[in-house]
Amino acid sequence: MRRNCHFVNEKARARSLYISLVRSLFESCSIIWRPTNQTLTAKLERIQKQAIKWILKEENISYSSCEVYVQKCKDINLLPLSARFDLNDLLFLHKVIYELKPVNLPFYLSFFNGQSRLRSCHLDNLSLVSSIHPKSTHCTTRTSNPLANTFFYRTYSKWNSLPISLREIKCPVHFKFMLKKHLWKSLVMPDAESSFLIDDDE
């Protein structure tokens, strides 16, 4: 992009080019192939860092600090790729749960039925529970177990962590809008939620 689109000076136009030409490649079927470890995620995140530097004309400025990078993402309303992958995962799971996709939950996931052996259980009727768990050995950890990295298994706990007021939203458009706000709020200061706009069409 830096070589072929060097003539683009407007931030909004440069941002649109990045979204349509680069980020769209990362988002194609990301619920299937998304990286599940920090090393691979960081490699993809570096591509977006370079793109943001190009958009903001700050190619000589370091974004090595996580706080700086998140702030730059916020300045041009681009979620960090790791959060964007979570967004896509949760949007798809939401459509499965509310039967907006012709896909069923796997056999090992079901909704919490109110019975728990734990005294302090924070699950509700929209929480998902798994009947199986990846086995951990000295050679296999939760993060390296194939089941732990599959879409439904890695996503159901993220779904449970969302506020129930968010999970109760059935409209996919409204859910996406509110989920973006929630993800931004988790990335920046709690009182910064309303200090920037979230495009509803991305």
Where do the language-model regions lie?
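Hydrophobic/basic alpha-helical segments
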Residues: 1-202
